[in-house]
Amino acid sequence: MKWCVLMLALLQSLCCSGLPLYQSELASTADKALVVTMTQVNNLYAGLRLYRVTRGSIKRVVPLGLNTYDLMMNFGIKETDCLKSSGEDPQRCAFRVGFFVPAASCTARVRVTAELTQVVSLNCGQDSSSSESSSEENFTRKRQQLNVQPSGNRGPVLPGFSEATLFPSHSFSRQVEPQPIPRGDSIGNHLE
């Protein structure tokens, strides 16, 4: 009995509740976190069309205090037929069909409390199963950059980049032309 009280006191001092998050609670918490995350993706990153979740999993649950958790999530997204201006729920929209439909793999850290669900960080990059080729360029947004402004603006762009260079053609990656690397010797290229 003394051991249990000491263990509970230790867990409380380390800001852990010591109480497990049960599977049913985890599922509803993860669903709520995924909805908030997809709202952020569609508000900040999507072009003309909405994106929808294709797959998802919880990588890790980090307890921060009593009823406060950080969920580390992995999920995939793909563009749908619904226009962003339609106001439709993305989960009710059909996926676009085609060879070059944008898709991405994302990771997110979402803080869930009893009152609030907040995206702490979000990172999406070209999906490995996507048909687009070339080098990959990931985009990352941190908590202070994810605040959606009430005026409906898309939010701040990373310093040094314009929105056009970050998200050309409504895709999460851009094609980069390879630059010739000088050889460093005096022999010229006779094939030019």
Curated annotation (Swiss-Prot):
Residues 124-192 are annotated as: Disordered. Its main location: secreted. Multiply phosphorylated at serine residues. The keyword Secreted applies. Residues 128-137 have a biased composition (Low complexity). The keyword Disulfide bond applies. Disulfide bonds join C82-C93, C106-C124. Keywords: Disulfide bond, Phosphoprotein, Secreted, Signal. InterPro entries: Cystatin_sf, Spp-24. Residues 1-18 form the signal peptide. It is found in: Secreted. GO terms for biological process: bone remodeling. PANTHER family: SECRETED PHOSPHOPROTEIN 24. Could coordinate an aspect of bone turnover. Belongs to the SPP2 family. This is Secreted phosphoprotein 24.
